[in-house]
Amino acid sequence: MLFAFFPFLFLFLPILVWLWKLTSGEDKARLSVLLLGASLLFGACQGLEALLLLLGLTVVNYLFGLLLADEGHRRRRLGRRGLLLLAVLLNVLVWCRFRHLPALSAWLAQWQDILPVLAPAAMPAVFSFAVLIQLAWLLGVYQRRIRPEGIVRQALFTTCFPYALSGPLVRYEEMGPQLDALEVPQAEDLARGLGLMVLGLAKKV
């Protein structure tokens, strides 16, 4: 499901706006949960396997973030720099495993037929963007610019559907305040947003 597809424009988006208005009088935490649920549904439409892998990687990265944010960890055997390098290595290995190994195996299959059988399926673009977003988040935690704020917030920041599929790559410093200020948009904001969507779709025609 892409932004230009009818299921998104006439089913997913209207239902989300309706549910958003119903939840508007509640705690903002519920709006975060609603947006997370919508983002997970959107991600599942791109590929359930990639979404499950991404959620698992999000949990692992969040645990790395907790360790990096721990003030007492610098005195332990594996310092903060070592933790960061380990986290980056893990993310890069997973990213290469699912983004580049299929193409490499297809190329090598010209000489060896068994390789395509062993190769995993290629992951959608949402996986690549999310991995890069999480790497930037880990770097921000390492540099003490941000702190972990809960696994729900981390999952929402990573999978938020407006930018998870095609970018742009965002930093938590940019998105954190926006996630804190979730609210029901005014009519003029909705009209402006729909106008931008129509303009974007027109450019694709």
Where in this protein do the model-derived segments appear?
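Membrane-embedded transmembrane alpha-helical bundles that form the catalytic cores
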Residues: 1-205
